[in-house]
Swiss-Prot record:
Signal peptide: none annotated. HAMAP family: SRP19. It comes from the Archaea. It holds the Pfam family SRP19. It is found in: Cytoplasm. Involved in targeting and insertion of nascent membrane proteins into the cytoplasmic membrane. Binds directly to 7S RNA and mediates binding of the 54 kDa subunit of the SRP. GO terms for cellular component: signal recognition particle. Its main location: cytoplasm. Transmembrane segments: none annotated. This is Signal recognition particle 19 kDa protein. InterPro entries: Signal_recog_particle_SRP19, SRP19, SRP19-like_sf, SRP19_arc-type. GO terms for biological process: SRP-dependent cotranslational protein targeting to membrane, signal sequence recognition.
Length: 92
């Protein structure tokens, strides 16, 4: 079973590509939380586990991470784009 890790920095509009953002700027959102990301992952159809004590290596403050389980059929970039779209929809 494949496990993908999604750090909030991957979807953060305040981060540059060098700082860790992995989606296009128009898909990125301002300061996404692990709760929003986990909710979006579940809406996409995968299981999500929140690990709040983890810190992205390029950041100082711990924001946590989301571990996605069972995403064998999707590439990581496709998964990130779908999650970013759902996080945007959740905020509206």
């Amino acid at each position: 079973m494949v496990e993908n890790v999604i750090w909030p920095a991957y979807l953060d509009a305040n981060c540059t590509r060098n700082e860790g953002r992995r989606v296009a700027e128009d898909l990125a959102v301002e300061e996404p939380t692990v709760d929003e990301i986990a909710s979006a992952v579940q809406q996409v159809g995968y299981d999500a586990v929140i690990e709040r004590s983890k810190t992205y290596p390029r950041e100082y403050e711990p924001r946590g991470r989301v571990v996605v389980k069972g995403a064998d059929d999707a590439s990581k970039s496709d998964l990130l784009e779908a999650v970013a779209a759902y996080v945007t929809a959740i905020r509206e």
